[in-house]
Amino acid sequence: CDRRQRQMCIRDRSINERFTDSQTEKIGIRSLKIINKPDKDGKTFYVELNGQPVFAKGANYIPQDNFLPRVTEERYRKTILDAVNANMNMLRIWGGGIYENDLFYDLCDQYGILVWQDFMFACSLYPAEGEFLENIRQEAIDNIKRLRNHACIALWCGNNECNDAWFNWGWQRRYTQQ
């Protein structure tokens, strides 16, 4: 993964040409596509990074501790470096966990680890209307805005095991029996 990062500084000028505010952010610029096209076996599913096909090797990442404040910077660094040393280039943030803190994404940017970011909706059926749907929409907006400058974010995904539960785990049958 291309690890080049840039710093962008935005400054706000008042009418008298004095700077009134500024903000500096690290940003990563890259092109990433998920290639899904027909082939002899059905359909492809691979990552193309800056025009080059990439074999995604990685792991499913869950929260490191039930008590989140116990996860130290050293533990985050060790986790990401362990992934790098295992020749991984992608981690999937499990939708039953949490949106990780900024350090996690900063380290992934630094070490070239792509992130398959689940939205935090897993293993259940969720209402798809009204206030709950608006809450989901706002959660997506807030987290995409928060993480959008990280080059490590490869894709956003949702609905972890929700359809599987309905169609394959007997949820549909149990629901209709009630």
Each predicted region: which residue ranges?
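Single conserved hydrophobic/aromatic residue that forms the stacking wall/gate
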Residues: C1-I10
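Polar, glycine-rich mid-to-C-terminal structural blocks
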Residues: F167-Q178
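Active-site-adjacent substrate/metal-binding segments within catalytic domains
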Residues: Q7, S14-S124, G130-L155, E161-A165
